[in-house]
A protein has these predicted regions:
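Canonical Rossmann dinucleotide-binding motif of NAD(H)/NADP(H)-dependent dehydrogenases/reductases
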Residues: 45-86
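Short C-terminal tail/terminal secondary-structure segment
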Residues: 61-63, 154, 204, 265-266, ...
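Catalytic Tyr-x(3-8)-Lys segment
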Residues: 116-118, 257-277
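Substrate-binding pocket helix/loop in short-chain dehydrogenase/reductase
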Residues: 155-157, 161-166, 260-263
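Active-site helix of classical SDR
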Residues: 180, 215, 223
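Residue(s) in the substrate-gating loop at a strand-loop-helix junction
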Residues: 199
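Short, small/polar-rich loop/turn modules that mediate ligand/substrate recognition or access, typified
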Residues: 231, 236, 294-296
Length: 309
């Protein structure tokens, strides 16, 4: 069964030779377990030999077995382009599961690093450890995707506690700031890219989302400043505001069907975004060569719900 890679068709019997050739051309290590793994599912090979840090990149799946979180969807999208990945999160088991699946399926290298940016932690040291491990393992950083965020949803401003507010600010705004700052010298060397994550909660002031919205709008401001400061260094920094079908929404629908109907609305597109194909692929493009001129922008991926003047 033939498949395409960089515009060429390869039959399975030629895949081993092709894999060896690509390894020599682009300097990546072949997967010992599968010499054709680097070709399987590869789109254009945009990130072969490059390194991407993805926060919140642990594995999550839907009931049908497909990717069930935005972070894992982004993992897959970059793996299909041949990127080596540094994935972070608090849950070691989910990180290790992502590593196992991605390496087996796509032949890329994945470095999982437990990282918890929260109140009471030495957050600079936590983030610096991620950067140091990335450089020690791969020698370069080409893109940083700041996806991870925790928050207390459904709590009004009047009822919000400082602990709840800090949860959102530390895990979102502070984490994004620290990953950007610590990665900057390496991104400058590679003329890399940053994609940060914001939300319609901030754009439209969603009820019960005060700390989450505040963190996300802070991230948008930080992104615009970075676009101006780092543009001359060849680094572009953009924002994605996604709406996607995730395991969390699937579980919410199963557990509270009436609440789901009342609070989760179908976008005009008629479906919720696919975390890999409709969110992850856009993130890949924002970090790729064709979108280097896009800088400081907010991209809403909400199937028509995120329309703004």
């Amino acid at each position: 069964m033939p498949f395409a890679c960089r515009g060429l068709l390869f039959s399975l019997e030629h895949a081993k030779v092709a894999s060896q050739l690509l390894a020599r051309l682009f300097g990546y290590a072949q997967s010992a377990g599968s010499p054709v793994a680097i070709l399987k599912g590869l789109y254009m090979g945009l990130f072969i030999g490059k390194t991407v840090i993805i926060t919140g990149g642990g594995k999550a799946t839907l009931k049908d077995g497909s990717a069930g979180s935005i972070g894992y969807g982004i993992d897959i999208a970059f793996a299909k382009e041949g990127a080596n990945l540094v994935i972070t999160g608090r849950n070691v088991a989910k990180l290790e599961a992502a590593k196992e699946s991605l390496e087996a399926e796509y032949g890329v290298k994945v470095l999982p690093v437990q990282a918890d940016v929260s109140a009471g932690q030495d957050n600079e040291a936590v983030v610096q450890n991620v950067i140091d491990q990335a450089i020690a393992e791969f020698g370069r950083i080409d893109a940083v995707v700041n996806n991870a965020q925790a928050s207390a949803s459904g709590v009004t401003i009047a009822d919000h506690t400082m602990d709840q507010f800090n949860l959102a600010i530390y895990s979102g705004l502070y984490a994004t700031y620290l990953y950007m700052q610590k990665a900057y010298p390496h991104l400058k060397e590679t003329k890399g890219s940053v994609v940060n994550f914001a939300s319609g909660a901030g754009l439209f002031g969603n009820y019960g989302q005060c700390s989450y919205a505040a963190a996300k709008e802070g991230i948008r401001g930080l992104t615009r400043v970075a676009a101006n400061e780092w543009g001359p260094d060849g680094i572009n920094v953009n924002i994605v505001c996604p709406l996607a079908w995730t395991a969390a929404l699937e579980n919410f629908q199963d557990a509270y069907p009436e609440a789901f109907k009342a609070n989760v609305h179908m976008p005009p597109a008629g479906h919720y975004g696919d975390v890999e194909k409709e969110i992850g692929r856009v993130v890949v493009q924002l970090c790729g060569p064709d979108f280097k001129y896009m800088n400081g922008e907010t991209v809403t991926l909400e199937g028509g719900m995120g329309q703004r003047p």
